[in-house]
Every structure is written in structure tokens, then in C-alpha cells.
């Protein structure tokens, strides 16, 4: 299994299970509830006390971060069943509250 060639930043999180126990069959997209860079998101996920992660993150400028290798299960959706089957992606918001909009650049990177 390989990771995306779109990755521009890597900060691997300890918050994962290796290896995932199901083949990838879906994508789960979640918004960050903030306008974080891929580096800032990676710093959050590297903390073991956070107990959260995602395979990838996309910031408002379209940069892509890798936090959990695709061969491993991230802790993204609070559902082990889902996370074992999904590539999980956190996407930065370019405005806070309301509709939690994401930038066109980030959306198109998806």
C-alpha cells in the first residue's frame, strides 16, 4: 500500500493502529474546525494525549500532510469499524463557524 504522492509534509502520529485490519473501501473527510496549516495539524496529532489522528490533512493553501501511513488505521472518526476501512482526511476551514467553509484550493485538492 502506498501513500499519496501529493504529500508535502510528514509528521507521523503515534495515535494509530498498525496495521489496519480491513482493506480500504472508503474515504472519510472531516473539517478541522479551524484554519490550521498541515504543520499545525500534525503537531496536534503527534501528541499521544490527543488520542486522534487522520491519514492526511489539507490546509487552506492546498498543502497535503501525512500523519498516518495508509497501511495503518488512523483514529479519526470515533469508529474503529470506519477507520479500518477508510482513508481519513482532515481539511482546514478558511472561515470559522457558520457553514465551516473550506477554501476552493483545499476542496479541489480533495
What do these predicted ranges mean?
Residues 2-109:
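Active-site-adjacent loop/helix surface patches within enzyme catalytic domains
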Amino acid at each position: 500500500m502506498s501513500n499519496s504522492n501529493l504529500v508535502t509534509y510528514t509528521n507521523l502520529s503515534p495515535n494509530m493502529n498498525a496495521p489496519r485490519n480491513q482493506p480500504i473501501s472508503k474515504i472519510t473527510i472531516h473539517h478541522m474546525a479551524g484554519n490550521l496549516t498541515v504543520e499545525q495539524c500534525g503537531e496536534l496529532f503527534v501528541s499521544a494525549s490527543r488520542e486522534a489522528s487522520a491519514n492526511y490533512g489539507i490546509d487552506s493553501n492546498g498543502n497535503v500532510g501525512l500523519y498516518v501511513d495508509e497501511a495503518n488505521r488512523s483514529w479519526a472518526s470515533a469508529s474503529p469499524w470506519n477507520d479500518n476501512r477508510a482513508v481519513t482526511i482532515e481539511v482546514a476551514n478558511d472561515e470559522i463557524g457558520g457553514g465551516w467553509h473550506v477554501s476552493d484550493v483545499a476542496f479541489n485538492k480533495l
